[in-house]
UniProtKB/Swiss-Prot annotation:
Signal peptide: none annotated. This is SPbeta prophage-derived uncharacterized HTH-type transcriptional regulator YopO. The keyword DNA-binding applies. It comes from Bacillus subtilis (strain 168). Residues 16-35 bind DNA. The lineage of its organism: Bacteria, Bacillati, Bacillota, Bacilli, Bacillales. It comes from the Bacteria.
Length: 70
């Protein structure tokens, strides 16, 4: 999931600082989520998916396939 989050951030032109601000997740926590996603809670993952405008399934898809975000 960490690579997928990074891919989606690049695709949408969102920096980690912007993602932190928009999700209201502090930078330290967000970095931990991105680097060690298995330890993240569902609510946090939902917030990240919402800000990146993708479904949770798309966020968790490590293949980085085509997403439906517009």
């Amino acid at each position: 999931m960490s690579e997928r989050i990074k891919q989606l951030m690049v695709k949408r032109g969102i920096t980690i600082e912007e993602l932190s601000r928009e999700t209201m997740i502090d930078m330290q926590t967000l970095n931990k989520i991105i680097e060690m996603p298995d330890e993240s809670d569902v609510t946090t993952i939902k917030l990240i998916a919402l800000v990146l405008n993708v479904s949770i399934d798309e966020l968790l898809d490590e293949k980085g396939g085509e997403d439906n975000a517009k």
